[in-house]
């Protein structure tokens, strides 16, 4: 019985040895495979391939680009005065550019070639889009226009009731629909002419009825003279009569130097 079991043990021992050798072979083979697969990975790490470059835009160029985009989207200030799809010949002067000639004869009718400014749209008599057209006007500079064709600033610091009559320098601007030569804004020396809201009829009525109490002088803002008339009972009537005449002819006016309404 033991003799029969001895060959069986030898076979088992041999099978274990073969199994051990096969495992070693497999492990050695896997190691070679891992080595072979690891080589491309190591090569890929050493050679990452083509690199992607990124360009950095300078701050100045970025600001310039942003300002250009902002300017392209901004609405020009003159567009607030320019009607859309109106007649080109009736556009305000701020909406067009004309090739004027200052050598024309003063007071004579002249024609000039004009072009609408960018972003302005207008049409001709046939309602067709137009950019170039001709305008008719009178040959004269803007400061030679009638007073009804321009607006001037007022001064509230000069005295209107003065002898000689005072003047002041005003800044005048031509109205939008008026065409002329030269600058549309110009200085001009004007007579002092402004009002503070005082009525001549009210001052005269107070002088006749309540002049003895100085009501007319108080109304005109002359409180010192008003107190003098109040405590002297109108100068015993003489001062009252004199004030009626002075206010009636316009010699006595408001204390702030303005004109009557």
From Swiss-Prot:
What the entry lists under InterPro entries is as follows: TM2, TM2D1-3-like
Q: Which UniProt keywords apply?
A: Glycoprotein, Membrane, Signal, Transmembrane, Transmembrane helix
Does the keyword field hold Glycoprotein?
Answer: yes
An example of a Gene Ontology cellular component annotation for this protein is: membrane
Task: State the membrane topology.
Answer: Multi-pass membrane protein
Those parts of the protein on the Extracellular side are: 45-193, 251-261
Q: Which domain of life is it from?
A: Eukaryota
- The transmembrane residues are 194-214, 230-250
Keyword Transmembrane helix among record annotations: yes
Where is the protein localized? Membrane
Q: Which residues lie on this side of the membrane: Cytoplasmic?
A: 215-229
Signal sequence residues: 1-44
User: Ranges for the TM2 domain?
Assistant: 197-244
Q: Which residues are glycosylated?
A: 101, 136, 154, 171, 183, 193
Q: Which family does it belong to?
A: Belongs to the TM2 family.
What this protein is called in its record is TM2 domain-containing protein 3
Q: Which gene encodes it?
A: Tm2d3
